[in-house]
Amino acid sequence: MLKLLLGDPNARKLKRYLPIVSDINLLEEEISPLTDDELRAKTADFRERLAKVSGLEKQRELLDEILPEVFSVVREASKRVLGMRHFDVQLIGGMVLHEGQIAEMKTGEGKTLVATLPSFLNALTGRGVHVVTVNDYLARRDAEWMGQVHRFLGLSVGLIQQDMTPLERRKNYECDITYATNSELGFDYLRDNMASDMSEIVQRKFQFCIIDEVDSILIDEARTPLIISGQIERPQEKYQKAAEVVASLIRAAEMGKDGIDPEGDYEVDEKQRTCTLTDEGFARSEELLKVNDLYDPKDPWAHYITNALKAKELFVKDVNYIVRNGEAVIVDEFTGRVMPGRRWSDGQHQAIEAKEKLNIQSETQTLASITYQNFFLLYPRLAGMTGTAKTEEVEFEKTYQLETTVIPTNRPRSRNDWVDQVYKTEAGKWRAVANETAEVHKKGRPVLVGTTSVEKSELLSSLLAEEQIPHNLLNAKPENVEREAEIVAQAGRAGAVTIATNMAGRGTDIILGGNSDYMARLKLREVLLPKLVKPEDGHKPPVPLQRRSESSGFGEDKDVTTDNSKPLSASSALGTLYPCVLTEDTEKVLIDLERKLVADWGDRALTAIELEDRISTAAEKAPTNDASIQLMRDAISLVKSEYDVVVQKEEVQVREAGGLHVIGTERHESRRVDNQLRGRAGRQGDLGSTRFFLSLGDNLLRIFGGDRVASLMNAFKVDEDMPIESGMLTRSLESAQKKVETYYYDIRKQVFEYDEVMNNQRRAVYSERRRVLDGFGLKKQVIGYGEKTMEEIVYAYVNPDLPSEEWDLAQLVSKVKEFVYLLNDLKPDQLEGLDIDELKAFLQEQLRNAYDLKEAQIEEQKPGLMKEAERFFILQQIDTLWREHLQAMDALRESVGLRGYGQKDPLIEYKNEGYDMFLEMMTNMRRNVIYSMFMFQPAPESDKE
């Protein structure tokens, strides 16, 4: 009602941009006739104008002023280099991002292209722009693909990848625009703040950041802090023994109520993700371990048992992790991707290794950590884009001060979202999914089935194999991950069936009829890999299907026609990666190319990554002087033109049949992830449809739906293959999802509030560290520490309320000598008759003199050594004490929750105690540095030889 009276606020916001869009369109007539060189010269002209203005705020005002002309130049460059012209709605998206907001743009509306506008505009200041994606593959794809526009206009483009050296990282961060993943950026920031020398620092000062899939990074990953850790030794036998004990414990059938223990050894709360031993469980564990008390501080077992219980009940193989090469590798619950190198902390990963009988790796201790919330708030201006942000609008506004603007689609949407079907049992649901997939597949429509875990995707895969339906499987299993781009390239072909675990952040659009451009690149890769790539750099040629029924004949070579002009039949097209057999002339071109490249680059002399890079460059449209790359480019173009004939026919066929059909097999905890899956169908106004299949056994209904849904289902006397469509059930589902979202929002808010305390401390420590690394005024800093220490000693041993005769000056002098041995001649009678301020001033003067003397002694041995020592001792103390402080703060965080029972606010208690602990840490740091500096005795040069 309010919307009708006041008008839609989003529409009002969009209206504001329309005059600027008109200006950009008018400028197009002026910009289009320019030559490439004249277009490039515009960049230098913009930079010159910005160089005349100092200060970020003033520069931003000028950026707003030149925005229409800059956007017009970028649009023209994109037209020439990529063959893509920004639509008007994409220009609006660019302006929204430039203003530091979140642009919600539906799947397939060209978010990646939109980012070129604000990133180019803000990079003109020379302060650097970061474009953040969710994984290395997307960062590389965007840097190569969109980077062409920036490079064409004369800007440098950097890329940060997981395996880069610090030197490569620094070079890439120095570029005008740098593409990176959120985790690489965060870890580089933490590593920079652990550096022992300025030369080790790779990042420069943050300015502007655009986050792709902003909801995935700022919301889904916000519960997990980034942690850099060092190893600590813990007895491995304890993990193994705990796993054995827990295997023999029995889970209680239901949670205990009203303080009464349930029957069983332990209870599990799936909502809170906790496991708790009952009284019987405690007694049984102690008996099996032959100990008197699980909490005995000399031989603690409780922590190991709790982690082993969680590993048994809450961490499920092929859902939360997979076992690969003898290691437990985490699976990201939002994207379905594996996260090698990441480990659960606090001994949880070791408990899982013990459960799976794997080699148990050392436990770790936190050296540095930060949450994504606080990391991204370090940027003076932050922007983001996603297909689904509106549901989390409030959180973006409250936590990050980011407004959300919904950008209209370029063409109206033609997707049908069919009503959910709910089944009584999981078995009934999966049979229904297999049946619907078969039905739609028979009509020649492509089908995408989204599952929530590796295990479920393999279950459906076996059901489809029974039905003899050829299909592709895309999940976290390593053999499937490597095929990701190939699988997605064919997912839109007639009758293609793709099973994918969590399509969120997959980053590749599903194009109806198939992606001929990508298939041509894959064909080139298939031809060149065996001849150009080193044997030890093992590769796998593209494989069209992971699963097919042996008896079906689908995809067998016998189906492939030898008549080159004919496309493959529908069934066999699904059994091969490529839409048609190439003509003899084209095959000959590929063989000649392969020979030429072997002659140029050497026989099997490249790594797989090097070849991928060269194929990517060849697939670009940017001009090249490299003859080999040009030959590859011509070959890709030739192959693509042949594939296009079939792909375009198939596209018409798929459109007529109704487009892509998306099936969801479970509602995700977040409505956003459901919307992302739906958004795969009907991109850019295409036809398409979606349907969700659910069962009462689904986690969402089981954990958050409450007893209401269960009793409702018992009331339905239906068999398991009968679907139920009920408004009441759908409402229960949506309220369950809202409950979960609120629950997780509260967790993230709590993580943020607690980390805010740490964040203020982190900023103070890191700025102190950076000052030391810069190396300016180190002596002044150390003397400052000494003066503060003298003041603290005076206040510790002198009571101003007592007459001066009663002051214990002997103790005071003794304490001063502990810190400064060079003041050994100091006598208590020298201090008699001085008031407190005079005492402080006298001791501080003595300290300064002693420090000058110490400096002279050290410098005599080696000039410049004193400065090195100052830097070494301050950094050593900051790092050691900060590490201990992080552990102490973690322990405080764990224990402070219990204060709630005493009617105290745990957060306020944490803030107060944390602040006291921080002050104590800084005091210890100052005192330790002073003590170390005076005790420092370098070995004479002759001793070192």
From Swiss-Prot:
What's one GO MF term for it?
ATP binding
Coarse class of the protein's main subcellular location: membrane
Which superkingdom, per the lineage? Bacteria
> Where in the sequence does UniProt note compositional bias of the Basic and acidic residues kind?
547-561
Kindly give the Gene3D superfamilies that the UniProt entry links to this protein: Helical scaffold and wing domains of SecA, P-loop containing nucleotide triphosphate hydrolases, SecA, preprotein cross-linking domain
List the catalytic activities from the record: ATP + H2O + cellular proteinSide 1 = ADP + phosphate + cellular proteinSide 2
Which keywords does this chain's UniProt record carry?
ATP-binding, Cell inner membrane, Cell membrane, Cytoplasm, Membrane, Nucleotide-binding, Protein transport, Thylakoid, Translocase, Translocation, Transport
Q: Please name one Pfam family that this protein belongs to.
A: SecA_PP_bind
**A cellular-component GO term for this protein:** plasma membrane-derived thylakoid membrane
One GO biological process from the UniProt record? Answer: protein transport by the Sec complex
Topology versus the membrane, per the UniProt entry? Peripheral membrane protein
Q: What is its EC number?
A: 7.4.2.8
Binding of ATP, residues: 90, 108-112, 509
Q: Which InterPro entries match?
A: Helicase_ATP-bd, P-loop_NTPase, SecA, SecA_CS, SecA_DEAD, SecA_motor_DEAD, SecA_preprotein_X-link_dom, SecA_SF2_C
Q: Which family does it belong to?
A: Belongs to the SecA family.
The UniProt function text for this chain reads:
Part of the Sec protein translocase complex. Interacts with the SecYEG preprotein conducting channel. Has a central role in coupling the hydrolysis of ATP to the transfer of proteins into and across the cell membrane, serving as an ATP-driven molecular motor driving the stepwise translocation of polypeptide chains across the membrane. Probably participates in protein translocation into and across both the cytoplasmic and thylakoid membranes in cyanobacterial cells.
Q: How does it assemble?
A: Monomer and homodimer. Part of the essential Sec protein translocation apparatus which comprises SecA, SecYEG and auxiliary proteins SecDF. Other proteins may also be involved.
This protein is called Protein translocase subunit SecA
Instruction: Give the organism's phylogenetic lineage.
Output: Bacteria, Bacillati, Cyanobacteriota, Cyanophyceae, Synechococcales
